[in-house]
Amino acid sequence: DTERYVTMGENKFSSRSTGLFLELAAIMDAVGMNYGERNYDAVRKAHPDWLIYGSETSSATRTRDSYFNPAQNLWHDNRPNRHYEQSDYGNDRVAWGRTATESWTFDRDRAGYAGQFIWTGFDYIGEPTPWHNQDNTPVKSSYFGIIDTAGLPKNDFYLYRSEWYSAEEKP
């Protein structure tokens, strides 16, 4: 099928990637980088002809209407005082990810970047990060979504929406 683009998403891209991995990427129509923002500039310089996009980005964690330390960027914070909640200020994230604001700013500021797919639109049952793999954890939800399991938007939902709608369309 020569009519459709072929792509892959991978989290191993860096300026030092070698071998079969690079050969495979070179034959793709578009190269997806999972959480590759830190390596993007070096990969772009090494491969200026690649169409590159963020195939999995952000991994911010949040609980709707729960707020912690707005001046701090918190990552993988699972201390007991959190009561199994993540901050809806947009300042909680996993160690390998970025906040929604950081991911969106990165995308906006790089003309050669073809866009991004955030992880994830909706919360889901499983991967209760940052509490997964801990015994006796009552948490089931993933925290990653910009919409929770009840279908209600979290604050970052409005950040993303504001980038696509004008004030006249959605005042």
Predicted regions mapped to residue ranges:
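Extended substrate-binding grooves/exosites of carbohydrate-active enzymes
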Residues: D1-P171
